[in-house]
Amino acid sequence: VLKKDEAVEKLKTLRSSSAQQRAYFDSFWSLAGVYTYADQWAYIAPKDNALSVSYLRNITDPRREDIRVTMNRIHADVTRLVSELDPMRIDYELVQRSVRYLVPKLIGKRFFDKYLKQVHALEILSEKNWARFIIGSMIVRRTLTAQGAERFVAGGEKRVRNFQPGVALTYPSEMLRDPSASTTNMARDEEIVAQEKPRTTNWLKRYFGADVKTQSKLGQLLRFQRQFQAAGGLGLDRHATASTLPAVLVQETYYQDPDEVRPWAWAMFSYCDPSVDRDRVIPLGKGLVKNPFFGLPFHPYHYDTQIASPWGRGAPHIQIAGQDILNIAITWLVRNMQAGSGKWMVEKNTMSPPEKARMLNNRLDEVIEYTKQNQYSAAPQRTPPTQVSPAVLDFINGAPTWMKDSLNLSDVQSGKTSKRGESGGAIELKLNQANAPLEMVRRRDDRTTEDLLMGLYCDVLNPRWARLDQVREVLGEDTPDEMVRALLRDDPKKYISHVNLLPSTNRPKTPSEQQQEITTLHGQGVIDNSEDALWELMLRGVNASSDMKNAHDKQLMEINQMLHEGEYVPVYMAENHGYEKRTVAWFVSQPAAMALTEEDRELLTQHYNDHYQAEMAEMQGQQMMQGSPEPGRPSPPSEAFRGSDMANAGAVAPAAQM
């Protein structure tokens, strides 16, 4: 079994062995930031016994000897990648181990849906994409945040505190991994993983109760991030490193133990004080403790993975070579534009240097005066202008296309076609081919997000900190108490085997695509009638019938009123009974309806029956109106009068009373 002293030594070894690799990746990632946001013309070179990003002077540098132009194509392609893989929702299903656990699964799904919104999980999954596509990797980690002050229980012998599980973003630069790591799957292939981050002493006091005195400042500890913060060109490095808050380096380390069945069984929180000894590791709290999370809490998302590499590559690293060539071509073109009509050619000793500087320019209102040495002296004249090759212009104009090609992006993904009149089948084939590389990234994202959701679900309902009152508050008062207790009765790992992420999370369809899909299914006979097609579209958020949408929303409000107030809402003849009746049936058919009480079901059943009776009465009235003559017109003869003398034929029917 792993001991605290052994855990401390392992962490010290990890910190010292990974320092050089971390320094290299800091420069590598900073270069990607420069090419995405800043002036480019950059490279990695040794400086002060370390690697750092260096720059050639460009057009914005007043010390330049000549101009260098930046035509940034990388930022546009990164933005496009981010928008292509931006999740719009989190759709998933919990898979229970047996039918016996159906109720905890259904109530757990309802609880977890609300909890994901509470911890802003969708925002975190969306924000990760910017860093992931720029530097190549980004980590979404599970967190435990202490809330409120400690409370004494059991006669003052024990102290308890509320903990709130959640999610947060972690940059790869904060991670400590063994330099021998050769895969991007740290949870599967490594034995020790740590996160090291500067934290203020107030943070340590708030979360660990440790009163640490130090001479180190937060700005000093952030210097390892300085070139990465400077990469965006906003001067963030100067502001962050100016902080004078007292701080130390805090490590959060997780260990595998061959003597434990549970993976990543141990965790240790510690800190280093660089002002005293930056290599000394001081454990916090109880030191080595059981891992409070379900497995390793770090979930990395990657873009372009390399063989035998611990991290992915971003789009800028793929496009840097092409971007440099484009910048060189643009710079050459602008230099030729500046040359105008060619250079001035002046006979020696006919003009002084001040006269040349004053008169030999492109201004039409400047007079050129020169001294003629003899009758054969030549006046100043320009040389022929530099000829711009059409091939260079074609190269520059084609740059956006071949730079997108390096990322496997295509114009057809933006709705552009290669020629007019191209068939829909050809466009769809091109689109599928263009989307194949992005689909591979989505599949990897799906697997990572499934692991993230499974871990977070087990963390949230962990019996160590899941409280009945907190779960009941999230679920609301309409959930029966016995179902809430059933949810907390067992460990989530006992009744949930895994999480399946649904395609709508990373592959959302536009309203027009959904409408086309439903229309096709209706045309093929998969959906029976047009009303079913309109209903399916409405449930997907595409409203093609205002009457159906209004009736659906109104009925949901009536259902909510009946369930919360316990009072019946009457039905009126003028309502759209068909749509509202369908809404009631749809509502009680959902898995969440398992939580309805018997009284709730009786109210909804009575409401449904009243809509049904009103609908039948309306249909009977319409039939009667169809069988009656219009006011002032004779009614048709009955069968009894057929063949008679029609003596009473032509009687006028009274007008229908409304």
Language-model features: locations:
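Extended amphipathic alpha-helical segments with heptad-repeat/coiled-coil character used for oligomerization
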Residues: 143, 390, 424-550
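Generic, well-ordered alpha-helical scaffold segments in large soluble proteins
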Residues: 111-118, 322-336, 340, 362-370, ...
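Charge-rich, acidic-biased intrinsically disordered regions
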Residues: 34-53, 143, 346-364, 420-427, ...
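Short coil/turn segments at secondary-structure boundaries
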Residues: 91-95, 123-131, 142-146, 337-349, ...
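Long, highly charged low-complexity segments enriched in Glu/Asp and Lys/Arg with interspersed Ser/Thr
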Residues: 528-558, 591-632
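Short amphipathic alpha-helical heptad-repeat segments
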Residues: 573-585
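Extended, helix-rich architectural segments
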Residues: 1-266, 270-272, 276, 388-398, ...
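Extended, charged amphipathic alpha-helical segments
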Residues: 235-420
